Amino acid sequence: MTLSADLLLHAYANGVFPMAESRDDPEVFWVDPKRRGILPLDGFRISRSLAKRLRRDDYSISVNRDFAGVVQGCADREETWINGEIFDRYQELHHDGFAHSLEVWMDDALVGGVYGVSLGGAFFGESMFSRRRDASKIALAYLVDRLNAGGYILCDTQFITPHLASLGGREISRAAYRRRLAEALDQPGDFISPALPSPQVLLQRRTQTS
């Protein structure tokens, strides 16, 4: 199957997403889980240890500075669903303003990040990676803050892992997901405009919304 940016956007709007069996497999298939993972934007959990890590402020955050580097970081593992076709099409979505990344830097090195697709008030988190301890958690904390600031009402994680569950992620039924998706697509979401907060402001906002 040949992907296109328009086909991808149509698929996301209908609740399905693409995957490949491996990096070297050229084929792409559609996934529509019976149980869908979401990260409630008012229920993101920041543990004491993560709050302490955020306050250390020995990192910097950027948005859309190195989208390709984040996708490559996510694909740089023994088993990955990101093949060449998927990589290229998400670069196209990024160029068109529908796919975004959030990066974590330490000592001028990209050490973590997350990327996904934005449609209306829905953000479809595709993947994340970490090369330093807690870097992906830091990325998610800033992502959730950004989604809240930008007016998003749905953060789709596709599946739930123990890592996501520890941060507040949960599963809902396909029918419940479709209802939330339809509502989110009717809402405006702005990924670009919100300013990056300081760690102190991020933690204060989280306390106010939890």
From Swiss-Prot:
It catalyses: N-terminal L-lysyl-[protein] + L-leucyl-tRNA(Leu) = N-terminal L-leucyl-L-lysyl-[protein] + tRNA(Leu) + H(+); N-terminal L-arginyl-[protein] + L-leucyl-tRNA(Leu) = N-terminal L-leucyl-L-arginyl-[protein] + tRNA(Leu) + H(+); L-phenylalanyl-tRNA(Phe) + an N-terminal L-alpha-aminoacyl-[protein] = an N-terminal L-phenylalanyl-L-alpha-aminoacyl-[protein] + tRNA(Phe). GO terms for cellular component: cytoplasm. One of its GO terms (molecular function) is leucyl-tRNA--protein transferase activity. Keywords: Acyltransferase, Cytoplasm, Transferase. It comes from the Bacteria. Its main location: cytoplasm. One of its GO terms (biological process) is protein catabolic process. It is found in: Cytoplasm. InterPro entries: Acyl_CoA_acyltransferase, Leu/Phe-tRNA_Trfase, Leu/Phe-tRNA_Trfase_C. It is an enzyme of class 2 (transferase). Its EC number is 2.3.2.6. Belongs to the L/F-transferase family. Functions in the N-end rule pathway of protein degradation where it conjugates Leu, Phe and, less efficiently, Met from aminoacyl-tRNAs to the N-termini of proteins containing an N-terminal arginine or lysine. This is Leucyl/phenylalanyl-tRNA--protein transferase. It comes from Ruegeria sp. (strain TM1040) (Silicibacter sp.). The lineage of its organism: Bacteria, Pseudomonadati, Pseudomonadota, Alphaproteobacteria, Rhodobacterales.
